[in-house]
UniProtKB/Swiss-Prot annotation:
Gene, per the UniProt record: rpsJ
Lineage: superkingdom: Bacteria
Gene Ontology MF, one: structural constituent of ribosome
Gene3D superfamilies: Ribosomal protein S10 domain
Protein name, entry field: Small ribosomal subunit protein uS10
């Protein structure tokens, strides 16, 4: 018999909100009787944007901004119907992107 697995990938700009959301998901899945692996921290994407400070000249004067995207991975092995139902009803904060694969 093949094992069923739900893979949840979480993305957010703020790592504190991301860790709270991951902890809620793990707690909900364990409470409903499923085996949970994670949260596994994935590499953080860092995007750097360089812009000119001045509008017209002074090309040597530049400013850099960066945007970090933090990611976590959670695997739920052999989920019960109660697990899926509890995860559907779970209320997570805005700012967290959730990608679910069955």
């Amino acid at each position: 018999m093949a094992k069923q697995k739900i893979r949840i990938r979480l993305k957010a700009y703020d790592h504190r909100v991301l860790d709270q959301s991951a902890e809620k998901i793990v707690e909900t899945a364990k409470r409903s009787g499923a085996n949970v692996s994670g949260p596994i921290p994935l590499p953080t994407e860092k995007s750097v944007y360089t812009i000119l400070r001045a509008v017209h000249k002074y090309k040597d004067s530049r400013e850099q901004f960066e945007m970090r995207t933090h990611k976590r991975l959670i695997d739920i092995v052999n989920p019960t119907p109660q697990t899926v139902d509890a995860l559907m009803r779970l209320d997570l904060p805005s700012g967290v992107d959730i990608e679910i694969k069955l």
